[in-house]
A protein has these predicted regions:
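A short helix-loop-beta-strand connector motif used in the catalytic cores of GNAT acetyltransferases and
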Residues: 493-504, 534
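Conserved beta-strand in the GNAT
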Residues: 504, 512-521, 539
Length: 596
């Protein structure tokens, strides 16, 4: 992050100048551990920037180009804020430097320590003071709550309010390492664990913010565990309150993702409020929310808000409790407390509005997540078609399952839900088996021969037909297969890890290994603990040379080293041209000292 901070400043300044609009840069990594950091870019309306502007900024930051466009446009105006991470002030200074590289006269408002919603709020309405606005809301609340602030900026804000109904914990903003550590909304949702501070009072409602205070979840103690009131429960309570206040619910909607439990969806529909499912991600929820008079949307992690695109007389008190452009954990908390207070609903009654169906969510690694494409709302696969057909076969009217590609790595997420836990578990096993059989190992064809890509495994020692794996290595260098027994081989495999691994190519139906490549990743102190990839021991069975398997092995290794800032290999002179064709180039000289 440090390495690209200047360029981020320059890129946002360019966009601000080009559009003649103010922009915001929030330095935060939200719910992540203290050693991570990142930025969120905000437009002049306090909204998240559109995808096209996000792409423009990313392309400039990731390019080698350090030049900037014509400066004969408007003067950039940038608002900057950051949360409590140790690296934030340094990143802020570098971003300011980058802004001034574009134009030294740029207008820069450094707000320093703020929450993400606070910076959005500032851009939405410069005349309103966020803390004063929160104080006015507090005057309307007397419902007690204990709030875990994740040792983040939320504690810094709440401690300024000092109201009797509000008890705070985990407010240590000085010890950077405590940020989000065994506390905060993500910890509560993911681990279903009690935060480190937990007050033993069974009869009190508890809440947890995350590090930059843009999300909130609620819970109460139940023996040694907690009953979680997540984003769906938050949406349900708000929808219930609105349904009692408004006669015509036609233009009111609850926006959710496929991960919302069907019991929740059915509860909302019974209230007379429509539900709309979008793709995962707050940007997708927010985009749909703009289409209705009132839209309620919360992800299960507690990130969300209520958008009042049209004011309703009976809801004017409620409207002021929700952030107008983005999820705000503190305002959302106050809004929920206001509803509980107005309706006299207990936390137990809130929790029992509906009961979730049994469900299971799992993540599986696949060889190429780009093989998986979904409908717009992600509830069905459009590719691979046979996988969706299989899902339709194993699910009945009481069960559902959807699959979607996830994140930057080659993973897919599988969600299964049903009325019966045994049925859910059975479908989970079927999904795991299907994915393992079809998508974990890459399959490809060369010269009408079918191959798979795999990791070297202990059972590969058992292949006895010539050439075995050890015989294959003897085509590369000196090795005596007779001197390596099963125990030695197994110990070697046990010592392989994510930074030292061997990829092999096999015939699909015989499992004979016909190609192998070794990858090592070395973590450096330089380049912010950057990694260097080393490619070693590339070999293809001599009977299959000329099939393109060597190029395939190198491509596999390069893909595995995507998190490395450079990749190094050494080779014999006769192989130099081959590796040049694979994208490698001369870089210095490689010397070696072999022990006799």
């Amino acid at each position: 992050m440090i390495d690209i901070s200047e360029k981020i400043g320059t890129a946002v300044a360019m966009v601000s100048s080009y559009h003649n609009n103010k922009y915001g840069i929030m330095i935060t990594a939200s719910h992540n551990p203290h050693y991570y950091n990142g930025v969120k870019i905000i437009d002049s309306n306090g909204e998240m920037i559109p995808e096209i502007e996000e792409k423009t900024i990313e392309e400039f930051v990731n390019s080698k180009n350090s030049c900037v466009e014509d400066k004969n446009m408007s003067l950039p105006e940038i608002y900057i804020g950051y949360d409590t991470r140790e690296s934030s002030p340094e990143i802020c200074n570098l971003i300011i430097k980058g802004i001034k590289i574009y134009n030294k006269d740029s207008i820069i408002h450094n707000l320093k320590l703020v929450s993400t919603p606070e910076l959005h709020f500032k851009l939405f309405n410069e005349d309103l003071i966020y803390i004063e606005y929160l104080k006015n809301l507090c005057e309307k609340i007397n419902y007690p709550v204990v709030c875990d602030c994740a040792n983040g900026v939320g504690g810094y804000i709440l401690n300024k309010l000092n109201y009797n109904f509000l008890q705070t914990s985990n407010t240590n903003c000085i010890n950077y390492e405590s940020l989000n550590f065994k506390s905060g909304s993500d910890y509560v949702v993911t681990e279903r664990e009690i935060p480190t501070y937990f007050n033993n009072n069974h009869n009190k409602l508890h809440a947890s913010l995350d590090g930059d205070a843009d999300r909130i979840v609620f819970y109460y103690k139940n023996n040694d565990s907690i009953n979680l009131l997540n984003g769906d429960k938050i949406s349900a309570l708000i929808a219930y309150y609105i349904s009692k206040k408004v006669e015509n619910l036609e233009n009111i909607a609850v926006i959710h993702t496929g991960y919302s439990n069907n019991s929740f969806v059915n509860f909302i529909n019974k209230l007379g409020i429509k539900t709309i499912c979008t793709a995962t991600g707050v940007k997708n929820l927010h985009s749909e929310a703009l289409n209705h008079d009132i839209s309620i949307y919360f992800e299960s992690n507690g990130h969300g808000t209520v958008l009042f695109n049209k004011s309703y007389e009976n809801l004017k008190d409620l409207e002021q409790f929700f952030h107008p452009t983005i999820g705000d954990g503190i305002m959302d908390m106050f809004g929920i407390l206001f509803i509980l207070q107005e309706t006299s609903i207990t936390m137990y009654e809130w929790d029992n509005m509906y009961t979730d169906n049994p469900y299971h969510l799992l993540k599986m690694k696949v060889f190429d997540k780009s093989c998986f494409e979904t409908t717009k709302n992600e509830l069905r696969l459009t590719k691979p078609e046979d996988f969706q057909q299989y899902i339709d076969t194993v699910c009945d009217e009481k069960t559902r399952c959807f699959v979607r590609p996830s994140g930057t790595e080659d993973n897919i997420r599988i969600y299964v839900e049903g009325n019966d836990i045994n049925a859910v578990n059975n479908i989970v096993m079927l999904m795991e088996s299907w994915v393992s059989s079809n998508y974990i190992k890459e399959t490809f064809t060369k010269n009408d021969k079918l191959f798979i890509v795999d990791d070297l495994k202990k059972e590969d020692y058992d292949y006895k037909l010539y050439p075995s794996y050890l015989d294959l290595l003897s085509q590369l260098t000196i090795i005596n297969p007779k001197n390596i027994n099963r125990e030695d081989f197994n110990n070697f495999i046990d010592n392989l890890n994510q930074n030292h691994f061997i990829k092999v190519i096999k015939y699909k139906y015989t499992n004979q290994i016909v190609g192998s490549i070794t990858v090592l990743k070395e973590t450096k102190l330089i380049h912010d603990f950057g990694k260097v990839g080393h490619i070693e021991d590339v070999v293809v069975d001599k009977a299959l040379r000329g099939y393109g398997l060597g190029k395939k092995l190198v491509d596999i290794a390069v893909k595995e080293c995507q998190d490395c800032y450079k990749i190094i290999l050494d080779c014999n002179d006769e192989n130099v041209e081959f590796y040049k064709k694979c994208g490698f180039e001369w870089k210095g000289n490689q010397l070696a000292l072999y022990k006799k």
